[in-house]
Every structure is written in structure tokens, then in C-alpha cells.
């Protein structure tokens, strides 16, 4: 029997007689990790790696007297592989070490044993080499790849990681989940069973009176770290020490990895549907496929069945949603809806053609009232036009072509009927485009293109009041941009040609019509720069005047039906365009000049734009005679004046404003003003005022802000997706107020509470779904961080409605095993 004071050991199946206090031997083979050690060279002069058995002729004394040579590694491996054989080297440390070679080693006082990614600390450790078994007593702590266990007694076989731990506390690396048990049985290094145990993601503190805000208590837990799943048997979920849910068997995630099983139920209270309970079940079909089945009970309507299927491949992806409500008790009929989206490419099988692009967007519902009764299911409270749209496209080099079919379902409201758009059954498009290309020996620099469109427009003539038609449209254009740092000039010529074949005669008796319209435009601009200083800051100030002239002769189009044209909105994006209309049924006559000027203040170091101010106005040299059906021609020689400003002087503040001013009436026709204050994460307030004279006037306010600021608690900046610390309340919401009607149009108001390991949310949502009707619902959710969510889910509602809303918790990467390194 030999004893040694506090010193490191490397254990070996071969005993070496030693007389020094530092004992070194090897067990197994060299560990291919962060370091490499060598024992002194034998008589032949070659070195023997640490962990390899020396030749029989190597003098034992020489091996013991010469220090080990360690070679450092630049990084520690995140995954620690086993060495050759099934063992790595085993290291032991302690105040006192005793034992028998090849049989057992006993470490007393500050005992420690390490192998690979496993470390064991205790008051006493007994290591039995033949069985590779460890017994530990007193203040035992084991860390296996970042998962930690603490308790009074541990017995484990290291090579199989099989054994038990009595009365341990544990903490898992992947999500911070922790708890305690009467006993833990280790099945292997990836599987264990905890008996009469608890589980929570609340961070434990050192107070003896500490209790988690929530915990799951169970007769037993089965933890699978390969699948990153836990299973609780005979479980009760307790919140604030009050039992709220019981489960005979319940599985839950140990990370964000997907798994099949029941998802948390959602609860909704709605003035339209009553109280709703929905229980989703998730199917993890494959890494690139999944599905969700979501049955629900609505107290006012009945049983609703919903489902979703998603797939993702290298060249395509898609999503299918379906919903059926048999025997709706409020409408006395079956209700249903479906939606399908697909996008990707397919191989045509012909090398000359190559791949084809395929895009599908199909949606349909059972009746006209669906959008009003189920605004969430139909994805939009104003979704009254549902498309069944399918497109096959192809492109190669400068050429592109597509075939499309588009059919609409129009959901009518008797109090606010709409004219349905035309179906396109089918539509063929093609275009050929060249940029910076040569032309007729004139050299390069020309941009030219030819595009064609053939469409069959179809709709109910009793609703549209005009015949259906086959329309062929062609547009050719040629331009030559001259560009320089000081400015640009771009002359352009266009030719529009259109022909129609009608299924019923026009008012003049014609069953066909044609139209050819040329257009010439000249776009030009200059750019001046200077260094300037404002309010103590240095900027590069620009002055960018622009002039745009367009000339299109008049062609009578008053008898032509309108299938897809509409008036362009008058704004900075459209004021410098040739046609006053979108679509191809109306080409506006024009003899006008648009003048504008923009000035910007740019940060000379970053190029960031601090201020932008712009003005634009059209000067008309002749009346615009081409109009949409029922509209009046434009005779004003001077258009409304557009004035816009954008200010981002400091990152926290932003300001945007656009005004359309009528110089004749000296009144604003349209105006919008928006301001946002965003000093940091989870602090944002935005407000906007929008007015269109004699039509609408609205005030829009949105916010997310910590209420704790009111009493001086500023919290901590933990970064986006991590909140600002526990015990904090956040106000969230958005209000849209109609000034003429003196009422709220839409409203979302809520409060979130961050309790560190749990988050509570209460959100009130009011949605206008008709001229005189609205839907009000209350969304309540309890989120047990890293575990589950219970109740209605308001997160997507908040994200899509509250400007710059941030989640209090977002997915983060699994921590490194060195986070809990011992």
C-alpha cells in the first residue's frame, strides 16, 4: 500500500514502483484532446506517447525520474472523443491517495477523478480498476459534458456510464433545466431516469428557502439527451406552488429540437366565437417535413378541425393548410377553408430547356361570411379577395417566359360590395432584355427590351358591365443612359401595341379593337456635394436636382374595357414615370415635365443618411385626356406639390413626413407624419398621423415599453431576445383612431411580465371586420421559458401589429460545455 499527498495521478493497469510523492502512470491509450504528453525516450532513443505501454526494455526508473513534456493545443474540443480502445486516460487528485496496483485506488479529501468529458469531485472517491467502477461519498459532484449532478452518494461504471446517484440535484446544459430527485439511475451517458423528481428552468439560487416559480413534479422522469426530450410519468405542473395541470404521461423538449407530440393547448375568448379551446398535435415526419393537427371546441359554433403540412427540399418548399367546421351552430351550415403555397423549380427533362420555376398560391373558403367570422384563420381581417394562382416560369440568359392561371374568389359584403377582379385563364408572358448592349454598330451602352403578354380575361359580365376579352399586348423600349459622378441623362423610347378580341360587342358594335401608342422620355439629374456643418456635426451635403420629360401622343381609348389598369398613386416613387396608370389597358397621353430636387446630409465616415428633404412637381403642357372609366380628365397645368422629409439625426429618433399640397386651393390633399423613438431594446414608441382630405383622417400609435421605468427601475441591457431582467412589466399595444368617426378602428393593448423563467401576457384585441361590426377577444398566455406555453398565443399578433416589437425570449444557441466547466 502506498500513500501520497495532494498530487495528480494518471492511473495505469501496469504498476510502476515509485518513491516520489508525484505518481504518474497510464491507463488505456493516448487521449487525442487538447494536449499530448510524452515520457522519456527508451534506450533506443525514440519517444513513447503518454498512454502507450513502453517497451519491456525501457528502464522503469528512467520513466519515473524524467518530467513529462506537454504539447499545447490552440483550442479545446467542444466534443471529447474516446481514445482507442474504449477508454481515455483517467486522472485522479486528492489530499491523500492510497491503493493497490491494478485493483483499487482510494482518494480522501478534496478527491477528484477525471476522464474525457466527465469529472467527479467528492470527499472520498474509490476507484476499482478491473470493473472501471467509481464509488463516491460526501458532497459528490459529477459533470458529464456540461450536465451537472450534486448529492451525497454516487456509484457509476465509467466506461458504460451506468450507475446511480442518491438524492441528487441536477442541472442540464442545453436549456438550464434543473431539479432534484430521490434517486437518479444512469443508463448510459445519454439516458437517465430520475425517480420522485422535479424539473424546472428557473435558475436556482443559494438561499435555503428558494422555491422555483414553476416546476413539474413527477413519479419519474426519463431524460434522453440524444433526442433532447424528457418524459414525465405521473406528473403535476405547479405554478407558484399551486397545481394547475396533471398528466399521466407527458413529454417535453430539452432544447428547440423538434419532436412529435402534444403541443400546449391554446385558449381564446372572442365576442364572435365564444370560448375556444384548441389542442394541437405535432408530427415530426422527417427533418424536412412536418404536420400539425389542431382540433378545437368553440362554445358558440361547435367542433373545428384544422391541419397544416409543411415540406422543404433543396429546390422547392410548400405549405398546406385546411380547416373544417361541420355544422356551424351560428350559421347552420358547414364551414371550411384551405390554403396552399408552393414555390421552387423542377427539372423539365429536356437539356435545351433546363429547370422550370413553379409557384402556387391557392386559397378558398366556404362562404362570403368566412372572413368576418374567422379573421385569424383567413390571415387578414380585410381578406375578401382569395386567389387561386398558378405560374410556371422559365428563363435562360436574356430571355424569360411564364404561363399563369389566376382565378379569384370574391367575398361580398352586402353593406360594402366590391367589383370582382378579372380571372386570367390563362396568361402567357415573355420578355427579352439586354443591358449595356451594342446596337447596329453604334457601340455598347444601350438598354433595350421587348415584352409580350397574352391574357384571357374572364368575369361575370352582369357584375363588371363589360365584355370578357382575349388581349395581346407588346411593349418595346430602348434607352441609352449616360452616367457620371456629376449626374446622368437617359433618353428612352417606348412603343405600346395592344389588340382585343371580345366575347360580346362594345357599345359601337365592334368585337375587336387595337391600339398603338409611342412614348418618348428624357430623364436627367445632377449631383453637387459640399462639406457642411450643422449643430456641431460635420456632414457631406448633397444637392440633387432632377428633370423628367415625357411625351406620349393621345390615342382614344374611351371605348376600350378596363381589365387591369388603375391610377398610379401620386408619390415620389411614381412622379418620375411615363404612364399615369398601372396595367396595360390605359396608356396616358402626356406632354409634361416633372421637376424635383433632393438634398441629403450624409455622415462622411459611415455614409449614413441623417437628413433627406425632397420636393417635386409636374408641369403639364396639355390636358391629359385619357382617363379611367368614370373619371374626369386632368386639366390643371401645375400638379400638386410633393414635399417630403426624413430625419434620422440620432439613432434613437426618426421622423418621416410627406405632404401633397394643392397650390390652387392652398390646402393639403394628403399628408402623413410619422415619428419613432427607439432608445434601446424593448423601448419603442411610434406615432403617425395620416390625412386624405374629405376621405379619411387617422391617428396611429404603437408602443413597447418597460413599465418599471415609471418607478426608476431601468433594468439591464441583456440584448435582443433576452429581456431586461426579471420582475419587469412591459406595456405593448397599437391604437388606430378615426378622427371623423371619433372611434377606434382597431386596437391592441396588452401587458407582459417577465419573471425570468416564466412570462405572463394579457392582450386585448379589437378588430373591425365590417362597416358596423367588430370582433373583440382576450388573449392570455403563460410561457414557461424553455418548457412550454399555455393559453392563447398573442406573439404573432403583437409582432405583426406593433412596430419594432421584440420577443422577450428568442432562441439562442446551446451553450458550450465549458459554460459549466469544473
Curated annotation (Swiss-Prot):
Keyword line: Cell outer membrane, Membrane, Signal
Superkingdom, taxonomy of origin: Bacteria
Region described as Disordered: 38-97
Signal sequence, start to end: 1-37
Principal subcellular localisation of the protein: membrane
Quaternary structure note: Component of the lipopolysaccharide transport and assembly complex. Interacts with LptE and LptA.
HAMAP family: LPS_assembly_LptD
Protein name: LPS-assembly protein LptD
Organism field: Polaromonas sp. (strain JS666 / ATCC BAA-500)
Gene from which this protein is expressed: lptD
